Amino acid sequence: MIKNKPVELIGNIKYGKLEKASMVSIRWAGFLLVTTVWISAGLFGLYILAFYASSLYTGNLERWNNLLEGLYEKGSGTATAGIGLHFAAGAIILMLGSIQLIGAIRERNPLFHRWVGRLYVLSSLLAAIGGLIFIVVKGTIGGLVMNIGFSLYGLLMLIAATETYRHAAAGRINKHRAWALRLYALAIGSWLYRMDYGFWLQLTNGFGHLHNFEGPFDSLMSFFFYVPNLLVVEIFIRSRNYKIFPLLNLFSALLLLSMTAFLLLGTYYFTRLYWGPAILEWFSGF
C-alpha cells in the first residue's frame, strides 16, 4: 500500500498537468476561432453593405443579379423590399454577433451587452422575415429544395431570436445563453454559405453545381450551411454538464485550430478578390 502511494501521486500530478494544458489549449483555440469568425463575418457584412446597399442608393439594383441571378426583377417591389431587408439586417447581425460572445463585455458592460443584444435580436428577426417574404413572393433560384431549405432556415432564425429575447427578459440566463448560441450558429450561416461555395468551386471546379442551383451539391448546401452549425452548438451546450477527458480536449483544440486555418485562408482569398475591392470602392465614393 505504501509503495503504491508515490505512483498514484505521480499519476495524479501528470493527469493534473495534462488536464490544465488541455483546458488552456481548448480555451485559446476557441478564442482564435471566434476572433477569426468575427473578423471574417464582419468583413462579409461590410461587403453586403458595400455592394447591395450602394446599389440601392445609387438606383442600380440590377447589379444584385451580377452575383446571384434573379435577386432583382422590375415590377416585383415586395420581393425586392424583402430581400433588401434581409441583406441590410443580415449585415448587422454578421458584424455584431461575435461581440455578444465576449465574456469580459458581458461582465463589465452589461448595459452595452443588453442593448447590442436587442439590436442583434431585432436584426435577426428582420433578416428572417425579409428572406421569407422573398421566398413566398418570388421563390429562390434553386427551386423547391432551396425553397424548403431556406424557409426552414428563416423559421429557425425566428424561433431562436424570439427564444433568446424571451429567456433574457425572464432572467433565465442559462437558457438565454443556450438560445443565443443557437441564434449565432444560424446567423453566421449566410457567411459560411459563401465560404463553402467558394472553396468547393475552387477545389472541384464546381462538381455537382449547376447554373440554376438545382444540382446535387446545391441541394446539399440548401441545408448544410446551418444544420451542422446547430449540431456543433447543441453538442457544446449539452457537454458543458459533463467532465471532458484531457485528451479529448486536446483533440478538440487541434480540430478548432484546423478550422481556424481553413477560415483564415478563405477570408484572405475572398477579401483579396471580392470583399476588399467592393468595400474600398464603397468608401471611396463618400
PLM features per residue range, with description:
Residues 2-286:
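Alpha-helical membrane insertion/targeting regions
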